[in-house]
Amino acid sequence: MPFLKAFKRTLKCTSATLLLSGTLLSPASADAISTDQATALIAALTDQLVVPAYTELAEESSQLVEVLDSYCAAPNTGDRSKVETQFHSTMDAWQRAQIIQFGPIYENKGPARIQFWPDKRGTGQRQLRQVLNNQDETVLPSGALAEKSVALGDLQALEYVLYNDPELTTQPDSFACHYALAIARNQEVHAADIVQMWVGADSYRDQVLNAADGTDVFFDEKEAASRFLNDMAGAIDVIRLQKIDRPMGLTITGARPKRTENWRSGRSLRNIQLNLESVQHFLAVEDGFGDVLSDIGKETTSQAAQQLISEILGHLAAFDQPMSKLVANPDARGDLESLLTKLRSLQSLVREQLAQDLGLVPGFNATDGD
């Protein structure tokens, strides 16, 4: 598998160097969990969360193709609500899987191929407008979008086509509708490829589950467990920094509602909820982080994390406006600041206390430097 060869030298040599230099773990924390516990942990997270999440994404993406194919055959008389419902189901599946920031997702252009966001320079929107304005049919043939900019074939592009000017997809023989279908087909193929890389021949799953023996990807089982821990912490950082703090701005006058994720389809809060539920599942699944913490006498850490996640989810459920309106609402500012404080506490709890209790070391993530 190409990505295994690409990662082999860097990951194994870096891990070995850090371990030998004593910079990864102190002697007291290095043995916090046993080889068997770490192996059971990574197996549980892989088989109960990661593989099912990508399988769901592949299934929903395939269903999206079917719904759009049927609708685009006669968009002027079709039921657009079915398209929107399936778009949301597909995006739900992606938001559940979004926490996973390693492995096959980084094969061929990375997570941006599924969702190019945030688009900080507006590059994607400019490309999309050009395609739609020119009715550029080079995006329509099978496989064409896989060779073009990720911003033209991802779920953000699909949201733009469906929601920026909905009337475009309702016209007979609509270019916009055909383009939406091409995007859906692009996502269907990509999601199926990811599942195949996780569970097919010479699979990434095998590389994870056999980490204790040393594989092309992981030096040992604790490096693999640390990778999962890092994704928990990274997901919390993305929520805090990119999905809430960035659109809020430093002051109410600096708020930028259109920086909220998926503001056109009104699902910014839903995305955050699903991301947090994935973090929660990493703790709550059988043989997951929560069970391991209990096994080593650190159940108070697990309980504190789960309690804080429940509080944050309750906080989100109390909002009665979309995030795009909340960030520009002076009356909501205090509630959003309180939410950010809770997320900072959760991030510290996971990255510091939970990691210390387990003897694991989370590394860098996508938000470092933001």
Q: Where are these predicted regions, by residue range?
A:
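Mature extracytoplasmic or organellar-lumen-exposed domains after removal of signal/transit peptides
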Residues: 32-370
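Bacterial N-terminal signal peptides that target proteins for export
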Residues: 2-16
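C-terminal segment of classical bacterial N-terminal signal peptides
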Residues: 20-29
